[in-house]
Swiss-Prot record:
Underlying gene: alr
Binding site for substrate: R138, M314
InterPro entries linked: Ala_racemase, Ala_racemase/Decarboxylase_C, Ala_racemase_C, Ala_racemase_N, Ala_racemase_pyridoxalP-BS, PLP-binding_barrel
N6-(pyridoxal phosphate)lysine, modified sites: K40
Task performed by this protein: Catalyzes the interconversion of L-alanine and D-alanine. May also act on other amino acids.
Name of this chain's protein: Alanine racemase
Catalytic residue list: K40, Y267
Annotated pathway: Amino-acid biosynthesis; D-alanine biosynthesis; D-alanine from L-alanine: step 1/1
Family annotation (PROSITE patterns): ALANINE_RACEMASE
Membrane-spanning parts: none
Pfam family, one: Ala_racemase_N
GO molecular function terms attached to this record: alanine racemase activity; pyridoxal phosphate binding
Family: Belongs to the alanine racemase family.
Length: 371
């Protein structure tokens, strides 16, 4: 996708905030524990390479991605630290992953058997993190019998396969009710007990686990949403670490006009002015990730909350202004403006979603500006 460098719409990313959040998490680690920065999905929309380098500078020991190509991109950027692919990958890519020194999550014996043959042919060895499905229902071994069979296979073919880690993912670590979390934790302990030799990494802690369940098992934290300064629970549970949000989303007024009473605005004529009003146009739309359903939400202009009127268009939306503003006046969609703040959570609440999705939806057409 073409990046809109000649349009004054931009995502401002504070790498200092990233570093602060990573350093805060590191300060909470116990002796022998490490931190992997989760930079999948373009670092949750923040920009994978700059964020990864900032996290490394702050002390991150490695990285987590979702797909092979993300891992390769990190390697091509010069990063030599451990990289774990958390997603499912075809065994046909085993040699590719091994050659790029990428560790991979594995949750089936079928992957291991197919990958082993290919790795043997190419004289390569692949690092494995055994995924355990303790209740997420996504990927991983679900019972001790299947897990033991996989462990035995890896040990038998140690020239091609190395068990570097074992892990699970909690589905309710960000919930006020700890019951299901505790059930998953117990299941994890049961499954890990199958391993006669413990691998280098044993991990179950995502951002929410590290925040609200500090006595978690294992020696590795996978720091995801909290690295970007956002509360994993949204606004259900308070976070006390003073995380700093790293992303602001800004644009500007490119058209300002006064319309008379009875004027309709936007596709479908869904808004009609009740009196003479000043209307401003902002050059960002749903093609940039600003959802069409944000009609009626408010943005910040000169410290004033201004309502989005009419439907959000593909490339633009319109706002009702309290007065005439100059062209080029800054519009804040996420972030601070003259002492007022709109958070990613505010946007998510209005859109009936989560702030993860709001961040990831910001398309590549919006340039990321780093400071």
């Amino acid at each position: 996708m073409v990046i809109g460098r000649h349009r004054n719409t931009r995502a401002i990313i504070s790498l200092e905030a990233i570093k602060h959040n990573v350093a805060t998490q590191i300060s909470k680690l116990k002796d022998g524990q490490s931190l992997f920065a989760v930079v999948k999905a373009n670092a949750y929309g923040h920009g994978m390479i700059p964020v990864a380098k900032a996290a490394k500078e702050a002390g991150a020991n490695g990285f987590c991605v979702a797909i092979i190509d993300e891992g390769i991109a990190l390697r091509e950027s010069g990063i030599k630290d451990p990289i774990l692919i958390l997603g499912v990958n075809p065994a046909s890519e085993a040699v590719c992953m091994a050659k790029h020194d990428l560790s991979v999550a594995v949750g089936t014996l079928e992957f291991l058997t197919e990958a082993q043959k290919l790795l043997q042919e190419e004289k390569q060895r692949l690092k494995i993190h055994l995924a355990l499905d303790t209740g997420m229902g996504r990927i991983g071994f679900r019972n001790t019998e299947d897990l033991k069979e996989a462990v035995d296979f890896i040990e038998k073919h140690s020239d091609q396969l190395k068990c570097e880690g074992v892990f699970t993912h909690f589905s309710t670590a960000d919930s006020k009710d700890p019951a299901y979390f505790e059930k998953q934790s117990q299941k994890f302990d049961e499954l890990v007990g199958v391993l006669k030799k413990k691998p280098k990494y044993i991990h179950q802690a995502n951002s929410a686990t590290a925040l609200w369940h500090p006595n978690f098992e294992g020696n590795l934290v996978r720091m995801g949403i909290s690295m970007y300064g956002l509360n994993p629970s949204g606004d259900m549970i308070d976070e006390t670490w003073n995380l700093e949000p790293a992303l602001s989303l800004e644009s500007e007024l490119v058209a300002v006009k006064e319309v008379e009473a009875g004027s309709s605005i936007g596709y479908g004529a869904t808004y009609t002015s009740s009196q003479s009003e000043w209307i401003g146009t902002v050059p960002i739309g749903y093609a940039d990730g600003w959802l069409r359903r944000m009609q009626g939400f408010k943005v910040l202009i000169d410290g004033q909350y201004c309502e989005i009127v009419g439907r959000v268009c593909m490339d633009q939306f319109m706002v009702r202004l309290p007065k005439k503003y100059d062209l080029g006046t800054k519009v804040t969609l996420i972030g601070e403006n003259n002492g007022k703040v709109i958070t990613a959570q505010d946007v998510a609440n209005y859109a009936d979603t989560i702030h993860y999705e709001i961040m990831c939806n910001i398309t590549e057409r919006v340039p990321r500006i780093y400071k």
